[in-house]
Amino acid sequence: MDTAVDTHPPETKPRYGLELLAVLSVSFGLDGITALLSFIRAQVTINHGLGFSKVATGPIKEATKSAYQWLDILDQVVSILGGVAAAFLAIVLLMRSPGGPGLGVGLDRLRSREVLQGLGFAALIGIPGIAFVYVARRLGLNAQIVVTNFPDVWYRVPTLLLEAVQQGIAEEVVVAAYLLTRLRQLGWTNSRALATESVVRGSYHLYQGYGGFIGNAIMGLVFGWWFQRTRRVVPLIVAHAVIDAASFVGYVYLHGRVSWI
């Protein structure tokens, strides 16, 4: 039997392990987990499915309901991990080039000051953003968006909060930290890179209408400007997560009670 000879230095193995995990997380690794959960759900349906549960009572019916709920929770967790996977891959790629402490994007350690800065950014962007959404809706610049259609279950709010954190990590690590870092390394000027980052951020919000593009492009300019001057991404993650958390949870409790939401 042939034996593979490992000629790579030992210090590269952890990096290769992270790289392998990152690639699988954005491709077939999480797909496999999702397929496994679907398979388990199918087996539960076959054994204790809709036809059976109509006549099932007591412990059997409750156990079936509980199984479906836990499968749904696992589905949500896998979905959130899938959203963070792109950020994980971006971090692994940043590790391949010298960037100083925290990969040159401020991921070395969490500072309490940065959390406060993030909360300040959330207020700076979020409060005018509410007025902007209202005006845009009145002018017909924004589409009517269903922020979340998550069913009314006990784990709805915790899941929405985790989704908000996932969005903050994914967007700010990829669009702010990774994109602006690589554009700088390609020799782009700050203004050109900032404009590109702003357009990219606005573009994937076009489903919200013109207002969604404009609002997020402005957010991109502010966040990108901050990152270019500080090289710290954590305040942006905090701000983005807080804004999205307020949007998601606010929609749950205000939709149908406030006419323009």
Question: Which role fits each region the language model picked out?
Answer:
Residues 1-104, 249-261:
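N-terminal, membrane-interfacial amphipathic/helix-forming hydrophobic leader that caps
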Residues 8-15, 64, 68-72, 106-110, ...:
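Membrane-helix interfacial "entry" motifs
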Residues 15-23, 72-80, 114-118, 156-160, ...:
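Residue-level signature of transmembrane alpha-helical entry/exit and packing/kink sites
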Residues 29-32, 126-130, 134-261:
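Transmembrane helix-loop-helix hairpins at the membrane interface
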Residues 36, 40-44, 73-74, 111, ...:
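Generic hydrophobic, helix-prone segments enriched in Leu/Val/Ile
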Residues 100-103, 110, 114, 178, ...:
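Generic structural microfeature
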Residues 101-105, 144-147:
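Short, hydrophobic secondary-structure boundary micro-motifs
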Residues 104-127:
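Interfacial segments of alpha-helical transmembrane regions
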